[in-house]
Curated annotation (Swiss-Prot):
CDD domains: AAA
Keywords: ATP-binding, Cytoplasm, DNA damage, DNA recombination, DNA repair, DNA-binding, Hydrolase, Nucleotide-binding
Cellular compartments annotated: Cytoplasm
The protein, known as: Holliday junction branch migration complex subunit RuvB
Region annotation Head domain (RuvB-H): where it falls in the sequence: 256-345
InterPro entries: AAA+_ATPase, AAA_lid_4, DNA_helicase_Holl-junc_RuvB, P-loop_NTPase, RuvB-like_N, RuvB_C, WH-like_DNA-bd_sf, WH_DNA-bd_sf
Pfam families, A to Z: AAA_lid_4, RuvB_C, RuvB_N
Family: Belongs to the RuvB family.
GO BP term, example: DNA repair
DNA-binding is among the record's keywords: yes
Gene name, Swiss-Prot/TrEMBL: ruvB
EC main group: hydrolase
Length: 345
């Protein structure tokens, strides 16, 4: 599947742009107020005691600022940040090399921590609890274990799939934070801030139009801002106001709900081919010529969160809201947009 303009996964362009607009302090980290307030207390307490802050688990959908928050935490603590990801740490020795190079109170950030191998996890447990690791030296009968002391450090683990974490690993995090989708008002503030940093001429109304189509996700909001900037430079002398933002979104085929053509095609397929559902995910994937994982991880979450799609024990169903969005008359027995319990698919 081609990269979607409203995909919440990161691209190289996103990574490069994020580096320039990423907030450095909690005061500049917009949204997620409960998380910010709690982290401010934890950070100040750790600094006052002169200790490493407790280990932190951050989870939530992609694009909400987990990596950004880890940078902010390290900056607020005044320590260095080492960044890696679960799939990169293939062997216990890889993790040992990272840990032994940390300075006291440093922050180690592991993205996609749910993808750590069991062997690596076993090494991580004593490192998190006792700041020690056991390394095997030699092979066969001559092999022996050496215990290495580590400096006190803070591990920040980030994941989009908290349910895949093993219980022993999850229990070793003293601080657990869930990031929620952002409101249009919060995203508007983020777009205005990003536009100012990037030198983009954008009115509050133009920023609000971009924000309301960004699916509650800062990464998407910033990506849409860059594409609208391109449109404005060619069509509107670089000025982004409400009409320019709307015209750019029409060109990008992102509707007012933040849906692109793939979202609309999925809803339309359920309505036209399966009478609105329920339909099993395998049948739906075959009809759309998409992989099951793409439907479950990329397309469905936002449709469900916004009340356009529900999952039942018998499969996927669209709601009245979906019919109205497609300009169709809903059947009388159609669900109004509230999910049903049970999901076996």
């Amino acid at each position: 599947m081609d990269q979607r303009i409203i995909a919440s996964s990161s691209t190289r362009e996103d990574d490069a742009a994020d580096a320039s607009i990423r907030p450095k302090r909690l005061a500049d980290y917009l949204g997620q107020q409960p998380v910010r307030e709690q982290m401010e207390i934890y950070i100040q307490a750790a600094k006052a005691r002169g200790e490493a802050m407790d280990h932190v688990l951050i989870f939530g959908p992609p694009g909400l600022g987990k990596t950004t928050l880890s940078h902010v935490i390290a900056n607020e603590l005044g320590v260095s940040l080492r960044v890696t990801s679960g799939p990169v740490i293939e062997k216990a020795g890889d993790l040992a090399a990272l840990l032994t190079n940390l300075q006291p109170h440093d922050v180690l950030f592991i993205d996609e921590i749910h993808r750590l191998s069991p062997v690596v996890e076993e090494v991580l447990y004593p490192a998190m609890e006792d700041f020690q690791i056991d390394i095997m030296i030699g092979d066969g009968p001559a092999a022996r274990s050496i215990k290495i002391d580590l400096p006190p450090f803070t591990l920040i683990g980030a994941t989009t799939r908290a349910g895949l974490l093993t219980a022993p690993l999850r229990d070793r995090f003293g601080i657990v934070q869930r990031l929620e989708f952002y409101s249009p008002q919060e995203l508007t503030r983020i777009v205005i801030r990003s536009a100012a940093i990037l030198g983009i001429d954008c009115t509050p109304e133009g920023a609000a139009e971009i924000a309301r189509r960004a699916r509650g996700t800062p990464r998407i909001a910033n990506r849409l801002l860059r594409r609208v900037r391109d449109y404005a430079q060619v069509k509107a002398a670089g000025h982004i106001d409400l009409p320019v933002a709307q015209a750019a979104m029409q060109m990008l085929k992102v509707d007012p709900e933040g849906f692109d053509e793939l979202d609309r095609r999925m809803l339309r397929t359920i309505v036209e081919h399966f009478d609105g559902g329920p339909v099993g995910v395998e049948s739906l994937a075959a009809s759309l010529s998409e992989e099951r994982g793409t439907l479950e991880d990329v397309i469905e979450p936002y449709l469900i969160q916004q009340g356009f799609l529900i999952r039942t024990a018998r499969g996927r169903m669209v709601t009245t809201k979906a019919y109205l969005h497609l300009g169709l008359k809903p059947p009388r027995d159609r669900a109004p947009g509230i999910g049903e319990p049970g999901d076996l698919f």
